[in-house]
Amino acid sequence: MFSADDFLGDDPRREFERLLVTRCRAGGAFALMLVDLDGFNDVSARVGAPTADLLLYEVASRLREMLSEHDAVMRSGNGEFAIFVRGMERVQNAERLANELIERVERPLTVSGTRFRLSASIGITLSPRQSGEWRLLLQDADEAVYDAKKQGRGHISISSAPPKR
């Protein structure tokens, strides 16, 4: 599990990249899922940073509940999370998990006395089936989440990067 200090650290993107490098070097199959909370910047601007941080923490907790102890959820930006799922080799399994994660995010939650309904878009890439180089994996997942967001709220897109040779 994670603590509030770990979650709300000064540079979550650096921690995220460090974990991605470590996972790539370790080898083995895993899924990288980038979860982007739809419209979160607007929500954050409306409610202020303290409430937005509590919202992010609650969403991260919900995501973590869906994973095993060998998997990881990290904040990768404002309203963005990276999820590493160890042993995930099949696109169908990754897609099924992503749908469950979206359903979990969409459940109403109350923070600081206000009820929120959020949605998320998810981009997925698999390693080592696609690319074992962390920057390429991140690029693939970024492109996939961008494609998901173009489809509208609550969508999933899977990287179409060519298989690793």
What label would you give each PLM region?
Residues 14, 132-135:
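Conserved catalytic/ATP-binding subdomain
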Residues 32-34, 158:
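Core hydrophobic beta-sheet residues of small sensory/regulatory alpha/beta domains
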Residues 73, 100, 114-115, 121-129, ...:
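Cyclic nucleotide signaling catalytic output domains
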